[in-house]
């Protein structure tokens, strides 16, 4: 991944969205697992940008199994630990917030690494919860909308109170069930051990910085566009999603991290709900260009079953923070295209 994983204007937008909360995190310390991942990088970049507004610097401990050659990790306010999060027993970093973003969220990758996927959501989560208790830090668990499985029609848009319709013995189960157990750990540490804790359930967050080999819909489509090849739509393309641009998602996540009073939050966009054919049409309209498409079967190295609909109820975010998604799907497509045209 090229080290320019973001649009500078996107980072400025996130920082501006959070301006009333800057003083609350001046001088704070953040431990971030999965620091080299898509969301982890955005958290670090945003915190470092906020650092420009104060002499009381925010400090970051960044943990990941590998790190790109990225300017983030060369900053004097960032300390790196290059190691598997499951194998770390001593962090030596007294912090205010622990953000557990480590995981394997891409279906192609967790299909090929199911055991590692499960234990990152369980072993590492327990270790970090124990550490949060020890140092009295607020713990944030990056879960997933996957924990809802394949909701029935009456539970879409899906509320945080929906218990899910999830199989424990399918290709996606390593990720879905791992996250569900991770959430259960958070629940009992919160009520039994009194750990300050919140959970994010992101719904189809996308934006600059997604790896070209991620295999989720936006990297896959835009990689094909860059190569002037038809985009590939799995099966009929009738499965629907709502998509949340990264600036809106990171803004919501920071709001919960800094000031969230509740336990579980859906993070995403509640409209529009699009099937892949409609997304293809919007891409052509937004970019003002003809883009060919073909329908294909799921590849052998990709889970053969996926939710048919995915759309969050984000009433909790709206009520608690007066939150609203600011970046439309049309604008999101333009921004992703602008970035991927240069870096894919």
What name fits each language-model region?
Residues 144, 183-208, 219:
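Conserved beta-loop-beta element that borders a ligand/cofactor-binding pocket
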Residues 174-181:
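Active-site helix of classical SDR
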Residues 1-6, 58, 84, 204, ...:
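C-terminal substrate-binding subdomain of Rossmann-fold SDR/epimerase-dehydratase oxidoreductases
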Residues 85-120:
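NAD(P)H-binding glycine-rich loop region in Rossmannoid oxidoreductase-like domains
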Residues 1-30:
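Non-catalytic terminal and boundary segments that flank Rossmann-like NAD(P)-dependent oxidoreductase
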Residues 29-49:
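N-terminal Rossmann NAD(P)H-binding glycine-rich loop of SDR-like oxidoreductase domains
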Residues 100, 126-172:
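Conserved Rossmann-fold NAD(P)-dependent oxidoreductase catalytic core, especially the SDR/UDP-sugar
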């Amino acid at each position: 991944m090229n080290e320019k994983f973001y649009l500078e204007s996107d980072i400025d937008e996130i920082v501006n969205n959070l301006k009333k909360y800057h003083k609350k995190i001046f001088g704070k310390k953040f431990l971030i697992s999965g620091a080299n991942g898509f969301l982890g990088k955005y958290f670090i970049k945003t915190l470092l940008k906020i650092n420009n507004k104060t002499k009381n610097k925010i400090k970051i401990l960044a943990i990941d199994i590998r790190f790109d050659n990225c300017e983030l990790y060369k900053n004097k306010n960032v300390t790196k630990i290059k190691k598997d999060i499951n194998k770390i027993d001593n962090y030596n970093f007294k912090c205010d917030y622990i953000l557990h973003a480590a995981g394997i969220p891409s279906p192609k990758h967790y299909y090929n690494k199911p055991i590692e996927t499960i234990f990152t959501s369980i072993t590492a989560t327990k270790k970090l919860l124990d550490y949060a208790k020890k140092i009295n830090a607020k713990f944030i668990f990056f879960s997933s909308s996957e924990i809802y499985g394949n909701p029935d029609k009456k539970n879409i848009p899906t509320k945080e109170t929906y218990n899910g319709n999830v199989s424990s013995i399918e290709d996606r189960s390593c990720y879905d069930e791992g996250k569900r157990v991770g959430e259960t750990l958070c629940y009992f540490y919160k009520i039994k051990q009194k750990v300050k804790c919140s959970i994010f359930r992101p719904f189809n967050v996308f934006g600059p910085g997604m790896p070209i080999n991620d295999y989720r819909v936006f990297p896959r489509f835009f990689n094909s566009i860059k190569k002037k090849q038809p985009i590939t739509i799995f099966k009929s393309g009738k499965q629907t999603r709502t998509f949340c641009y990264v600036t809106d998602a990171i803004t919501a996540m920071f709001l919960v991290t800094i000031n969230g009073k509740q336990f579980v939050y859906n993070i995403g966009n509640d409209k529009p709900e699009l099937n892949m054919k409609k997304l293809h049409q919007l891409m052509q309209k937004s970019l003002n260009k003809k883009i060919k498409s073909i329908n294909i079967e799921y590849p052998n190295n990709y889970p053969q079953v996926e939710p048919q609909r995915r759309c969050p109820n984000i009433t909790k975010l709206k009520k608690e923070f007066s939150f609203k998604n600011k970046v439309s799907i049309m604008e999101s497509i333009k921004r992703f295209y602008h970035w991927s045209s240069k870096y894919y």
